[in-house]
Amino acid sequence: MLQVIISPAKQMRAAQDAFEVLGIPPFVRETARLHRALLDIERNEGSGGLQALWNVSDKLLGPCLNTLHEFGPILKNGDLDNPDIARNTSPAVMSYHGIQYQSMAPEVMDDEQLTWLQTHLWILSGLYGCVRPFHGVEPYRLEMGAKLAVDDARDLYGFWDDKLACAIAPTGSNTTVVNLASVEYAKAVLPHLAGDATTVTCLFGEGVRNGKPIQRSTASKKARGSMVRWMAENKLEDVSGLTAFDVGYRHFPELSNKNTLVFLNEQAL
């Protein structure tokens, strides 16, 4: 079983389009708990406490607070029938609006490609844990690396513990996890994978220095989105097919191994 993990985007929108929400995320009660924790910070420390946690400018603080206050935790599928919640809820893959998602361009995929996404892709999230592309989500601000202590956990890595790994690659499923997530998000999953799971991390380089790929954040985000789209277009089911990826990059076997595939920008070859 092939499962792909990617990071979310900071930019979000309540996408008003024709794409239907297909169910709710797997950890709705945990999400509600984290939402309460954010409200507790505002009540006890004021908006400054949240500004420090979110690491946002004065200009962004107001919109982030509005997003927090408009958030209505969804605890069951029936909550999607609530107009106040429904108008703020969209399929996750349409809600995130960063470079990676623009490169993926799910809004122009056909039905078979979207079905592949829903079956094989997991979007990691500080607030939701992990979601399928068409699970309903609301705009929020909470990065996985945020220093948010909740209950007995000193941060979100402790809060989520092995929950995400168990959802993505259940014990006994012999899952291959294709890691297209940033280090910040990948470490919420990879250390907790069961022994029968395997991981392949894809790195995208703009050149080579001292025998290592030169990675640049913006280019890597764009390449990750392109790879997800390419996998959906080719309905990839076997990790061995990844080396054929050729959208602006080429597999570079000299720097790769069984757990890490390196792709270099074609202009650098």
Report each predicted region and the residues it spans.
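Internal, well-folded beta-alpha domain core
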Residues: M104-L269
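Active-site helix-to-loop segments that bind/position phosphate- or nucleotide-bearing substrates
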Residues: L2-V108
